[in-house]
Swiss-Prot record:
SMART domains listed in its UniProt record: RuBisCO_small (SM00961)
Annotated GO MF terms: ribulose-bisphosphate carboxylase activity
Protein name: Ribulose bisphosphate carboxylase small subunit
Free-text function comment from the UniProt entry: RuBisCO catalyzes two reactions: the carboxylation of D-ribulose 1,5-bisphosphate, the primary event in carbon dioxide fixation, as well as the oxidative fragmentation of the pentose substrate. Both reactions occur simultaneously and in competition at the same active site. Although the small subunit is not catalytic it is essential for maximal activity.
Gene Ontology process terms (BP): reductive pentose-phosphate cycle
More info: The basic functional RuBisCO is composed of a large chain homodimer in a 'head-to-tail' conformation. In form I RuBisCO this homodimer is arranged in a barrel-like tetramer with the small subunits forming a tetrameric 'cap' on each end of the 'barrel'.
Gene name as annotated: cbbS
Length: 133
């Protein structure tokens, strides 16, 4: 099952040219770009591992893309994403985030609902391997 997180998550994977174009767009907006990776894409896992430091002073998409490729090479079976942070007063948040690499086999999640005392509903997310069936 394909994990859907971030911008473009319902589209096919971006090509190298499309990734570079999105990075250039972020740089043109004066957003700081960073690269992160993880093996746990659970929705509550918002803190992925950073690849190096955010590139505050870099203005060239090719330089950022080089870091994306280095992260992909170092972590071939993990998720890799690009974030663009807007530090302008009033925003100060991630304005663009998209996954640029996925493992060959993506695990998914299942929502379990159980009824408790007084008809209360309890929900739990379960990690699930879809390759097992």
């Amino acid at each position: 099952m394909r994990i859907t997180q971030g911008t473009f998550s319902f589209l096919p994977d971006l090509t190298a040219a499309q990734v570079k174009a999105q990075i250039q767009y972020a740089l043109d907006q004066n957003w700081a770009v960073s690269v992160e990776y993880t093996d746990d894409p659970h929705p509550r896992n918002t803190y992925w591992e950073m690849w190096g430091l955010p590139m505050f002073d870099l203005r060239d998409a090719a330089g950022v893309y080089g870091e994306v490729e280095a992260c992909r090479t170092a972590h071939p079976g993990k998720y890799v994403r690009v974030n663009a942070f807007d530090s302008n007063r009033g925003w100060e948040t991630v304005r663009l985030s998209f996954i640029v690499q996925r493992p060959e086999k993506e695990d998914g999640f299942r929502l379990d609902r159980t009824e408790g005392p007084g008809r209360t509903q309890r929900y739990a997310l379960q990690h699930r391997s879809y390759a097992a069936g």
